[in-house]
């Protein structure tokens, strides 16, 4: 447990130095389990060590705490004293970016892209636009267990929807020979070896900072074994290639991590291979060979960055400039690809664009504009602080884009047909867009009976203003509801604080289903609203909607209010 104790010691010293006091047990424990999720299963053992560590740190003077932290974890010490930059509008400048950048968006084709992917995609795209250069789409498909064949096309479609400035598309599955070349070079230089230890044995040695017997191989022996791997001499799980790192590194995950594995149980549809590169090897190789100048990704990749830097140093390559942004919590939608797929297969979700999902195609089907998503994630920026994604902010930005384009129409949810007496037939004229007569008027004919929202009637409203028409009294006679004309005066309705509601005549009502995250809403709408598919409209008193299926009956997807 020495390595765990060293991690505890760093966390306790950091807490004490940051707050200029003795370390707080709860904060130290939370920091450990938050930054080292692999230790959560050992929480009980950690608590047993925590007391002695806290006692040791508490016994030190403030100066000694700083000195000790500076010695054993200089990066952690430095991060505590970094000056916080004043918040700027827009994204911060990137170092070494003048003259152009080469950047990449690198999704795994396990399913369609979602809002989390959009953050990385748009942030990189913004910097390409700012500095000029080359934006590469790199499909990271080296793990056949995580590849959905249909996702290749879905990713392309999502990229097109976002409007990214992609200059070149690369498939990692086309580049295995390049990974093998670098793997052999690392072995020849004595930086990698072929490990035949079973996983449990190696894990035990690693946790004790002890080299496995395979580590002492000569480059010639290791190369011969690697060639045997490529020739199919080993079975899955029997052997792998590991990078020689630092066995005394405080983070066990950094110690001699794997570069290649044998995989035969899951064939890859694009490559006939037995030996597969692991992510840190393929990413490092491609970031170098493709000339990446800057890499922007989530801080959950900080450990991967450190792993990849070993490869860059061993190969004598110049490392890109790395920036890591904080986690973005997204509530209210499903983002897990496996959970989405299971829901689709069970019939819980209608498809990858079901409105309850957080995929970009679900956003598009609802009428969310790609520019609105771009604006929202750029505003969030690339800071390392974890944030909560604001749907209201996204909706506000989307409204800025679609509001002026969206004609207004009536949609009556859960319609109840109500006869209205006392008025001659009349044609109501309602503006297509408030305050803009140049857009014209809708004509809605009234001739005796009309549809009203069930919710308004269930509230027991006795006096109602029919928007753009007239006032009515509502009479409830057992199960029968009827209306009586009560004049045209809008001011009278306002003085009575009467609800002003949407309505539709029986002969001018197009059946329409409004799909929302809370379920389908049956209703009727103006026929003019649903003449064109993919149109964005605003249903008055309901919200914006995208027309998904035009005609009679119609289907609309709720966007937001």
From Swiss-Prot:
Protein function: Catalyzes the attachment of glutamate to tRNA(Glu) in a two-step reaction: glutamate is first activated by ATP to form Glu-AMP and then transferred to the acceptor end of tRNA(Glu).
Catalytic activity: tRNA(Glu) + L-glutamate + ATP = L-glutamyl-tRNA(Glu) + AMP + diphosphate
Motif 'HIGH' region: where in chain: 107-117
MF terms in GO: ATP binding; glutamate-tRNA ligase activity
A Gene Ontology biological process term: glutamyl-tRNA aminoacylation
Location(s) in or outside the cell: Cytoplasm
InterPro entries xrefs: aa-tRNA-synth_I_CS, Gln/Glu-tRNA_Ligase, Glu-tRNA-synth_arc/euk, Glu/Gln-tRNA-synth, Glu/Gln-tRNA-synth_Ib_cat-dom, Glu/Gln-tRNA-synth_Ib_codon-bd, Rbsml_bL25/Gln-tRNA_synth_N, Ribosomal_bL25/Gln-tRNA_synth
PROSITE patterns reported for this sequence: AA_TRNA_LIGASE_I
EC number: 6.1.1.17
Entry keyword Coiled coil: no
Keywords of this entry: Aminoacyl-tRNA synthetase, ATP-binding, Cytoplasm, Ligase, Nucleotide-binding, Protein biosynthesis
Pfam families in UniProt: tRNA-synt_1c, tRNA-synt_1c_C, tRNA-synt_1c_C2
GO-annotated cellular components: cytosol; protein-containing complex
Protein known as: Glutamate--tRNA ligase
Matching SUPFAM superfamilies: Nucleotidylyl transferase (SSF52374), Ribosomal protein L25-like (SSF50715)
Keyword Membrane: no
Source organism (scientific name): Methanospirillum hungatei JF-1 (strain ATCC 27890 / DSM 864 / NBRC 100397 / JF-1)
Family note: Belongs to the class-I aminoacyl-tRNA synthetase family. Glutamate--tRNA ligase type 2 subfamily.
